[in-house]
Amino acid sequence: MEFSGTPQEWNAYIAGQPHAQFLQSYEWGVFQKSLGRRVWYLGGGEQKESVRCLAIAYPLKGTMFYLMCPRGPVGVPSDVWSKEFIKWSHEQGAQFARIEPIESVPMKATHVRDVEPSHTRIVDLSKTENELLSVMHPKTRYNIHLSQKKGVIVAAKKYNEITSDELAMWWALSSETAKRNKISVHSREYYQKLLTSFPYITLYQAKWQGSVVAMAVMVGFGDTMYYLYGASTQEHKEVMAPYLLQWQAMVDAKNVGYRYYDFWGVAPDDSSTHPLAGVTRFKKGFGGEVITYPGTFDIPFKKLPYILYTLLRHVKRSL
């Protein structure tokens, strides 16, 4: 069941899937290892029947752990391989298995709160720039042009070009944004490792009169450019820098051959109470189509430890 090929062979398969999932890339496993987690590369089948699953172990209390396949398994038939992953997870001694299937859901799975967003908005970059602009909300187009007139400058750097000062600026802006919007963020160490080691990262920054007013972390993998994280300051918000930053990232992605631009999470049906409600209106203005995945599912092997885990998670979130 464990994959015996090369990293290049792994990525060739994952990146070759429609709307390729970077969370199943070989390098995402390497990044998870750098965080101290155990990972496995699982695979089976030939050609059209081939399936891949990057499995990550997340620690629980003591020596207990659960195994997760983020945004996967990938391939056809994924429902059959979801069952294989669940069986394998049980054999490894996991307390439960967690999957985020692309399509169908195995029986006896418990639908839980999303880890990765189950609703997202995707823009088809095969259209011309004028066509992309024409399907945007008029206010979004206006803000893009306004930002250009105000003199906002957008620049991008690959993961191996990002400086320590830019990392510090990202942390400052993301912390400010999280506090303003009352959302949680990863640790500073997490961002530092991600931005400087994951090879599909591009860090965008928008400057106005020499000051950084907005930044965004993009991930380009396979046929898709993902807008993973965004941050901005309230100062000089009148120059509408995040709008021009997004537009420039879309144009850049189109010009280097990406087919899709994924906004990585929106609220379902524009729900006003969803955690992503605050950014959904902004993302919706750029057009595109809403795509819905089944969600995140747990398959517990031992009921009591799983019940205790869910209770502790609920208490922690309510504090």
Protein language model regions, located:
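A gly/proline- and charged-residue-enriched helix-loop-helix capping module
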Residues: 70-107
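Aromatic (often tryptophan-rich) hydrophobic motifs at membrane interfaces
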Residues: 83-86, 192, 196-307
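Terminal substrate-recognition subdomain of acyl/acetyltransferases
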Residues: 103-153, 265-319
